[in-house]
Amino acid sequence: ILLALCAGSGSGVLLATKWQLSALPQIVALLNGIGGLASALIVCCPFKYHKDNLLESLCVVIGLVAFSGSIVAFAKLHGLLRKNVAWLKWVSLFLEILLLINIAYFTYFQQGFAGIILLSILIGFCAIMPIGGADMPVIISLLNSFSGWAVVTVGLLAGDLLLIITGTLVGASGTILSYVMCKSMNRSLLKIVWPETQSIETEHKSTGIV
Protein backbone atom coordinates (compact mmCIF):
# COMPACT_ATOMS: atom_id res chain seq x y z
CA ILE A 1 0.00 0.00 0.00
CA LEU A 2 2.83 2.38 0.88
CA LEU A 3 4.52 1.66 -2.45
CA ALA A 4 1.30 2.39 -4.33
CA LEU A 5 0.85 5.65 -2.40
CA CYS A 6 4.38 6.76 -3.23
CA ALA A 7 3.97 5.85 -6.91
CA GLY A 8 0.66 7.70 -7.20
CA SER A 9 1.92 10.77 -5.34
CA GLY A 10 5.12 10.88 -7.40
CA SER A 11 3.20 10.60 -10.65
CA GLY A 12 0.85 13.39 -9.59
CA VAL A 13 3.70 15.72 -8.64
CA LEU A 14 5.52 14.96 -11.89
CA LEU A 15 2.37 15.58 -13.92
CA ALA A 16 1.67 18.88 -12.18
CA THR A 17 5.21 20.23 -12.48
CA LYS A 18 5.99 19.20 -16.06
CA TRP A 19 2.83 20.54 -17.70
CA GLN A 20 2.18 24.23 -18.25
CA LEU A 21 -0.66 26.08 -16.54
CA SER A 22 -2.45 26.51 -19.87
CA ALA A 23 -2.86 22.72 -19.98
CA LEU A 24 -4.79 22.65 -16.69
CA PRO A 25 -8.12 21.57 -18.30
CA GLN A 26 -6.39 18.57 -19.90
CA ILE A 27 -4.83 17.61 -16.55
CA VAL A 28 -8.19 17.86 -14.76
CA ALA A 29 -9.85 15.74 -17.44
CA LEU A 30 -7.10 13.12 -17.19
CA LEU A 31 -7.34 12.96 -13.39
CA ASN A 32 -11.13 12.62 -13.62
CA GLY A 33 -10.67 9.64 -15.91
CA ILE A 34 -8.15 8.00 -13.61
CA GLY A 35 -10.53 8.39 -10.65
CA GLY A 36 -13.41 6.81 -12.54
CA LEU A 37 -11.21 3.96 -13.76
CA ALA A 38 -9.98 3.28 -10.22
CA SER A 39 -13.54 2.95 -8.92
CA ALA A 40 -14.51 0.59 -11.75
CA LEU A 41 -11.42 -1.57 -11.22
CA ILE A 42 -12.12 -1.88 -7.49
CA VAL A 43 -15.64 -3.15 -8.15
CA CYS A 44 -14.46 -5.58 -10.84
CA CYS A 45 -12.12 -7.25 -8.33
CA PRO A 46 -13.69 -10.23 -6.50
CA PHE A 47 -13.82 -8.66 -3.02
CA LYS A 48 -15.84 -10.41 -0.35
CA TYR A 49 -17.91 -7.35 0.59
CA HIS A 50 -19.72 -7.21 -2.75
CA LYS A 51 -23.42 -7.57 -2.08
CA ASP A 52 -25.45 -5.87 -4.79
CA ASN A 53 -25.04 -6.78 -8.47
CA LEU A 54 -27.04 -3.74 -9.57
CA LEU A 55 -24.91 -1.35 -7.51
CA GLU A 56 -21.72 -2.97 -8.77
CA SER A 57 -22.87 -2.61 -12.38
CA LEU A 58 -23.86 1.00 -11.75
CA CYS A 59 -20.40 1.76 -10.39
CA VAL A 60 -18.74 0.18 -13.43
CA VAL A 61 -20.96 2.19 -15.80
CA ILE A 62 -20.39 5.53 -14.05
CA GLY A 63 -16.67 4.96 -13.58
CA LEU A 64 -15.94 3.83 -17.13
CA VAL A 65 -18.14 6.50 -18.73
CA ALA A 66 -16.15 9.05 -16.72
CA PHE A 67 -12.90 7.38 -17.80
CA SER A 68 -13.54 7.09 -21.54
CA GLY A 69 -15.29 10.47 -21.69
CA SER A 70 -12.39 12.14 -19.89
CA ILE A 71 -9.86 10.56 -22.23
CA VAL A 72 -11.81 11.91 -25.22
CA ALA A 73 -12.01 15.35 -23.58
CA PHE A 74 -8.25 15.27 -22.92
CA ALA A 75 -7.50 14.26 -26.50
CA LYS A 76 -9.79 16.93 -27.97
CA LEU A 77 -8.37 19.70 -25.79
CA HIS A 78 -4.84 18.59 -26.60
CA GLY A 79 -5.53 18.53 -30.34
CA LEU A 80 -5.07 14.78 -30.72
CA LEU A 81 -8.46 14.09 -32.31
CA ARG A 82 -9.46 15.37 -35.72
CA LYS A 83 -13.00 16.57 -36.30
CA ASN A 84 -14.92 14.64 -38.91
CA VAL A 85 -18.48 15.93 -39.26
CA ALA A 86 -19.43 13.17 -41.71
CA TRP A 87 -19.47 10.48 -39.03
CA LEU A 88 -20.19 12.74 -36.06
CA LYS A 89 -23.73 13.15 -37.40
CA TRP A 90 -24.36 9.46 -36.67
CA VAL A 91 -22.82 9.44 -33.20
CA SER A 92 -26.02 10.56 -31.43
CA LEU A 93 -28.02 7.75 -33.05
CA PHE A 94 -25.33 5.23 -32.14
CA LEU A 95 -25.34 6.57 -28.57
CA GLU A 96 -29.10 6.04 -28.29
CA ILE A 97 -28.70 2.45 -29.47
CA LEU A 98 -25.91 1.86 -26.94
CA LEU A 99 -28.03 3.23 -24.11
CA LEU A 100 -30.91 0.91 -25.02
CA ILE A 101 -28.55 -2.07 -25.15
CA ASN A 102 -27.09 -1.10 -21.79
CA ILE A 103 -30.55 -0.90 -20.22
CA ALA A 104 -31.38 -4.34 -21.63
CA TYR A 105 -28.09 -5.70 -20.27
CA PHE A 106 -28.91 -4.29 -16.84
CA THR A 107 -32.33 -5.93 -16.96
CA TYR A 108 -31.50 -9.42 -18.21
CA PHE A 109 -27.76 -10.01 -17.65
CA GLN A 110 -26.68 -8.89 -14.20
CA GLN A 111 -23.85 -11.42 -13.88
CA GLY A 112 -20.42 -10.48 -15.17
CA PHE A 113 -18.98 -7.19 -16.29
CA ALA A 114 -17.63 -7.90 -19.78
CA GLY A 115 -20.61 -6.52 -21.68
CA ILE A 116 -21.11 -3.58 -19.33
CA ILE A 117 -17.43 -2.63 -19.56
CA LEU A 118 -17.50 -2.50 -23.36
CA LEU A 119 -20.83 -0.65 -23.50
CA SER A 120 -19.76 1.91 -20.89
CA ILE A 121 -16.52 2.73 -22.69
CA LEU A 122 -18.37 3.17 -25.98
CA ILE A 123 -21.05 5.33 -24.35
CA GLY A 124 -18.44 7.63 -22.83
CA PHE A 125 -16.67 7.96 -26.18
CA CYS A 126 -19.85 8.61 -28.19
CA ALA A 127 -21.27 11.03 -25.62
CA ILE A 128 -18.25 13.35 -25.54
CA MET A 129 -17.01 13.09 -29.12
CA PRO A 130 -19.60 15.45 -30.74
CA ILE A 131 -19.17 18.17 -28.09
CA GLY A 132 -17.21 21.26 -29.10
CA GLY A 133 -14.38 22.96 -27.27
CA ALA A 134 -16.53 25.86 -26.05
CA ASP A 135 -18.67 23.47 -23.98
CA MET A 136 -15.77 21.36 -22.75
CA PRO A 137 -15.43 23.08 -19.31
CA VAL A 138 -19.02 22.06 -18.51
CA ILE A 139 -18.33 18.50 -19.66
CA ILE A 140 -15.14 18.25 -17.59
CA SER A 141 -17.05 19.42 -14.52
CA LEU A 142 -19.80 16.89 -15.24
CA LEU A 143 -17.27 14.07 -15.65
CA ASN A 144 -15.70 15.17 -12.38
CA SER A 145 -19.05 14.65 -10.68
CA PHE A 146 -19.30 11.21 -12.32
CA SER A 147 -15.99 10.16 -10.78
CA GLY A 148 -17.29 11.32 -7.40
CA TRP A 149 -20.54 9.37 -7.70
CA ALA A 150 -18.54 6.29 -8.70
CA VAL A 151 -16.61 6.63 -5.43
CA VAL A 152 -19.92 6.87 -3.57
CA THR A 153 -21.06 3.53 -5.01
CA VAL A 154 -17.75 1.94 -3.97
CA GLY A 155 -18.27 3.32 -0.47
CA LEU A 156 -21.79 1.90 -0.33
CA LEU A 157 -20.54 -1.52 -1.40
CA ALA A 158 -17.65 -1.46 1.07
CA GLY A 159 -19.64 0.15 3.89
CA ASP A 160 -16.97 2.87 4.10
CA LEU A 161 -18.39 6.15 5.39
CA LEU A 162 -15.29 8.15 4.39
CA LEU A 163 -15.60 7.10 0.75
CA ILE A 164 -19.29 8.00 0.76
CA ILE A 165 -18.64 11.46 2.22
CA THR A 166 -15.70 12.36 -0.04
CA GLY A 167 -17.42 10.97 -3.12
CA THR A 168 -20.59 12.91 -2.34
CA LEU A 169 -18.59 16.13 -1.93
CA VAL A 170 -16.91 15.65 -5.31
CA GLY A 171 -20.09 14.52 -7.06
CA ALA A 172 -22.29 17.27 -5.64
CA SER A 173 -19.75 20.04 -6.26
CA GLY A 174 -19.22 18.90 -9.86
CA THR A 175 -22.96 18.72 -10.49
CA ILE A 176 -23.60 22.16 -8.99
CA LEU A 177 -20.69 23.69 -10.91
CA SER A 178 -22.01 22.23 -14.17
CA TYR A 179 -25.45 23.71 -13.48
CA VAL A 180 -24.01 27.13 -12.61
CA MET A 181 -21.88 27.22 -15.77
CA CYS A 182 -24.85 26.21 -17.94
CA LYS A 183 -26.97 28.91 -16.33
CA SER A 184 -24.28 31.55 -16.91
CA MET A 185 -24.06 30.46 -20.56
CA ASN A 186 -27.88 30.55 -20.82
CA ARG A 187 -27.86 26.99 -22.11
CA SER A 188 -29.38 23.70 -21.08
CA LEU A 189 -27.15 20.88 -19.86
CA LEU A 190 -29.16 18.46 -21.98
CA LYS A 191 -28.46 20.53 -25.10
CA ILE A 192 -24.73 20.46 -24.33
CA VAL A 193 -24.56 16.74 -23.61
CA TRP A 194 -26.90 15.89 -26.50
CA PRO A 195 -26.14 18.47 -29.24
CA GLU A 196 -28.26 18.53 -32.37
CA THR A 197 -26.76 17.56 -35.71
CA GLN A 198 -27.22 21.05 -37.13
CA SER A 199 -25.34 22.66 -34.24
CA ILE A 200 -22.49 20.18 -34.68
CA GLU A 201 -22.15 21.06 -38.36
CA THR A 202 -22.35 24.81 -37.69
CA GLU A 203 -19.72 24.67 -34.97
CA HIS A 204 -17.24 22.66 -37.00
CA LYS A 205 -17.74 24.89 -40.06
CA SER A 206 -17.09 28.01 -38.00
CA THR A 207 -14.04 26.36 -36.46
CA GLY A 208 -12.68 25.62 -39.92
CA ILE A 209 -13.19 29.22 -41.05
CA VAL A 210 -11.33 30.56 -38.05
Protein language model features and the residues they cover:
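Structural signature of hydrophobic alpha-helical transmembrane segments
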Residues: 1-9, 52-67, 109-119
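Structural signal for the N-terminal portions of transmembrane helices
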Residues: 50-64, 154-176
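Membrane-interfacial segments at transmembrane helix termini in multi-pass membrane proteins
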Residues: 169-210
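Transmembrane helix-loop junctions at the membrane interface of multipass transporters and ion channels
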Residues: 44-51, 108-112, 133, 138, ...
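Cytoplasmic-side transmembrane-helix entry/capping segments in multi-pass membrane proteins
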Residues: 2-4, 23-35, 82-95, 137-146
